[in-house]
């Protein structure tokens, strides 16, 4: 009886601490803006593999390397907390992240995950792909997936922003993953917006990364239950 009471009280205390920590969590929201002349849309040339062309029924596929949205913001920018979490430990997320080779392109083009979080790699195409990850801080991997529906699971052992993933069979295929030791990151959507939730109160340096335009950093102080706005602006080349 005493043991059951002790277990109940321990569970109750942990629940209260968990609820309090999350109820006091802060949020960073914002946009990644684009300034300058909007670059022309670049189409991918898939002539090296007739199966890829057939998948798209002859239609051209736009590159996701630089996507300027209708409101002059950038899609596919990786935004994350770069500094301010030193000394804090966060449990590794157990849910799988996924990257799919579909239509001879990677889905998603940019994403984030935690170090040692499982990454499921899927080939949804009826053609040969190989996925070649090129981290500098973790062990690279390069494996073939010759059959439709094949799945493999890999991890990155160490944080790194960004890790390039490519296909040696199809030169136009590329994706980028931000690997972190914490879960505080986001990727801009088709409105250029991002949201980073669940932050402890503190002073942070937030970085926005873009495949073409590089990086920018901003400093922000987030209070308990606070929501702060941080906007970035990249200028076209």
Task: Map each language-model feature to its residues.
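Bacterial N-terminal signal peptides
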Residues: 9-19
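Extracytoplasmic copper-binding redox domains, predominantly the cupredoxin/blue-copper superfamily
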Residues: 22-237
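Bacterial N-terminal signal peptides that target proteins for export
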Residues: 1-10
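Intrinsically disordered, low-complexity peptide-like regions
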Residues: 2, 20-22
């Amino acid at each position: 009886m005493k043991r059951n009471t002790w277990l109940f009280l321990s569970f109750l205390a942990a629940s209260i601490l968990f609820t309090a920590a999350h109820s006091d969590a802060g949020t960073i929201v914002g946009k990644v803006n684009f300034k300058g002349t909007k670059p022309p849309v670049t189409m991918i040339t898939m002539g090296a593999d007739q199966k890829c062309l057939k998948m798209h029924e002859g239609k051209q596929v736009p590159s996701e390397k630089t996507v300027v949205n209708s409101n002059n913001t950038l899609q596919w920018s990786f935004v994350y907390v770069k500094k301010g979490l030193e000394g804090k430990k966060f449990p590794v997320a157990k849910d799988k992240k996924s990257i799919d080779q579909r239509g001879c392109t990677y889905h998603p083009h940019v994403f984030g995950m935690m170090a040692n979080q499982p990454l499921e790699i899927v080939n949804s195409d009826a053609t040969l792909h190989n996925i070649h990850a090129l981290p500098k801080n973790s062990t690279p991997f390069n494996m073939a997936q010759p059959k439709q529906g094949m799945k493999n699971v890999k991890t990155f052992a160490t944080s790194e922003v960004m890790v390039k993933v490519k296909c040696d069979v199809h030169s136009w295929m590329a994706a980028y993953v931000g690997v972190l030791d914490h879960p505080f990151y986001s990727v801009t959507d088709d409105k250029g917006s991002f949201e980073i939730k669940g932050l402890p109160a503190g002073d942070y340096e937030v970085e926005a990364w873009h495949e073409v335009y590089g990086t920018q950093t901003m400093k922000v102080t987030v209070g308990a239950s606070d929501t702060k706005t941080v906007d970035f602006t990249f200028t076209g080349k």
